[in-house]
Each structure stands twice: as structure tokens, then as C-alpha cells.
């Protein structure tokens, strides 16, 4: 067999890039946790490692090495003439501004937390057993919220809900809403803040996430109209909901058809179900790109094991695609299904009884 040196070098280059990126993920988590990015942005000019260490009460030698790694990765800018470091506006937008729709440190916390389960998941590959979200490192839940919240804040109120038939008007007047798989409550609180005449209940099977979500509601000033309860997707209480939401969670469920059927039972006759899922095409070959790679990898470590840990274990995966999602929704009894809108990272579907 003849080795094509050009292809070999391309592959080796990709491996080295990924090796550096894998190590770099932990450094982004450190930078976010210690406020290093925010301190660089606040400085508003190039500063030395000693100045950054002083501003963040950290060790200069560690900070200097961290800065060099960041500069090598393009996450921090380096002024060679003055041996100092700074954040460009774009770098600050992505790494230091929590209000930015492109704020990404949460993605790295999610990734670092997920890979801590690799030894256990390696064994599950052999046995076929699942691995529930609740079994993962606690950092995964904060990382997931940090990763998804900027996108929700940028799109949920301004474009996703308005793309649904008649939902925005109901929410403005006063609607009864259930947010299933709410996690730490980011989506629930965002909706409650935007629609003060409506009431919201967030449901999640993870009790520790529900405790945090209640704190988020208090901190967000919406606790009087928002409640959070521990419940699973197939048995959450209540009926006659005007609006039910699923944010990036349907594909995690072992029995999504059963979960969808319960949504149908819980909705008012003129109610709407919004399903937000990761962007995906129906064919594998159309998902072989950087976004697909990120979602397939996350799905291997998180989503597929989570589904396999539950009854039925359909394991749709994070790249299920519209055709498979539609099949699940229509099989559960819904008569109406459509793609309402999309972003480069999400597909937003509307279903009605």
C-alpha cells in the first residue's frame, strides 16, 4: 500500500491542531473561572503578564504561560514590541462579554466536563448500556447553560417565538406555559421576563438543576410567575397549556414518541409546541462539517448515552435531522408540523394537535 504523503501530512496537521485544541479547552475554562479574559478586556490596552496577574490576584508565571498559549491559538493578541497582551474587539466579544450572542466559554466548560466521563463511557461502548445526564460531572450543567443561553437570549424572543403562529400574541395577553427539560432555567426565565402577563413552569428530572433554576427565577425577578418542578417528560403535571417548549432536549430522550404524546395530552386544543433542536441535515454526508463534527461528538459523549439510559432508548442523537424529528412528532398524534425558522446552530419546529 502506497502512502500519499500530501494526504498524510494533512491528516497529521489536523491531529496536531486537534491535540492543541483539546489541551486549550481547559485553558479557556481557567480563563473564564479566574476572570482573565474579562480583566484583559477591562484593561482596554496591552498589558504584561505581571499586570494581568495583579489584576486577577493570580500567579504571574502561570498567567504568562497561559497568555502564550492563548496567543498561539488566536484567542489573545500579542504585542511583540512591548511583550504585552490584549484582546481585540472580536476576541472580547467571544470570550469576555457574557451579554454577547457569541459568548463561547461555556462550550469549553461543557466539553471539559463531558470528557471526564470517558473512562466510564468506554465501558458502555462494550456493554451498550446508557449513561444519564445526572451521572456526569457537575460542571456539565453550568457549561450547558453558559453555552446555550447566549443563543436563546439573542433569538428566542426576537425571532423564534414571532415565527410561530399566534404564540407571541397569546404570551403578551397571558398564556400558560410549560418548559420541558428546562435545566437551570435560562429559557424559562428569559420568556418570563419578556412576557409579564404569562405564567411559566419549568420541568426537569434533575433535582439539583431545579434547585438552581429556582434561584435563577429569584435573581431574575420573576419568581412570582415562574415555578420549577422535578418531573420527567412523559409525566409532567398540568393540562390546557397554551404553549409547551423543548429546548435542545427531545433527541436526549429515550422515548421521544411517548414524550411527544404526553405533550399532546397536556396542550390546550389550540395550543402550540415549539421544539428547538441542533441544526442538522437528514443525510450524514451533509453533516460532515465543523458544526456537524461538534454536534456528533457531543452526541457521542452526552446525548446518545443519555437516551440509551432510559426506557425504549431510541437514541435519535443530536444530528437527527428534520425527517426523523417529524416522524417522531407525527407518530405521536400531532396533525401539524413545520420548520418555523432556523439559525446556523438550531432548527425551530412548530407542532399543533
PLM feature spans:
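Short glycine-centered segments of the SAM/dcSAM-binding site in methyltransferase folds
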Residues: 176, 271-272
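C-terminal alpha-helical "lid/dimerization" subdomain adjacent to the S-adenosyl-L-methionine
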Residues: 276-331
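Core SAM-dependent methyltransferase catalytic element
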Residues: 332-353
